[in-house]
């Protein structure tokens, strides 16, 4: 699928979820960067939240946003590592219809260029859930 340069840009509403046991609203730098990049790209922040590394809470938040007609997409930062606390992919498994396997592959390729083989510690992923990506 090629990008059509003639196609009109349509901004969407994006929700940002930070998953962390150690960050709060005052020091959520990853969430802040995502919000800034969403706005710089011309999209709108539809919602923002911070959840602890708890699969039930993450899945509940995602279900609420997926069901919200004002949210077009959700971006999550955190919880994709290899420790026992990292449960974001497992929470996504509870709400997804389909995986988008190429996302994780490209994410790790780009990360490899910066951090080398440490990128294998990331379980970054993307899914489709009831029409929300």
Regions found by a protein language model. Give the residues of each.
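Non-catalytic beta/alpha edge segments that cap or flank active sites
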Residues: 1-133
């Amino acid at each position: 699928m090629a990008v059509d340069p003639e196609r009109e840009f349509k901004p969407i509403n994006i929700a940002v979820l930070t998953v962390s046991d150690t960050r709060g609203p005052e020091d959520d730098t990853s969430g802040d960067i995502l919000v800034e990049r969403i706005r710089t790209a011309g999209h709108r922040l539809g919602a923002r939240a911070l959840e602890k590394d708890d699969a039930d809470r993450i899945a509940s938040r995602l279900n609420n946003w997926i069901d919200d007609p004002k949210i077009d997409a959700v971006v999550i930062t955190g919880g994709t590592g290899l420790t026992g606390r990292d449960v974001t992919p497992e929470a996504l498994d509870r709400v997804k219809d389909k995986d988008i396997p190429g996302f994780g592959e490209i994410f790790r390729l780009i990360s490899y260029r910066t951090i080398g083989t440490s990128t294998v510690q990331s379980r970054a992923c993307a899914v489709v859930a009831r029409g929300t990506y």
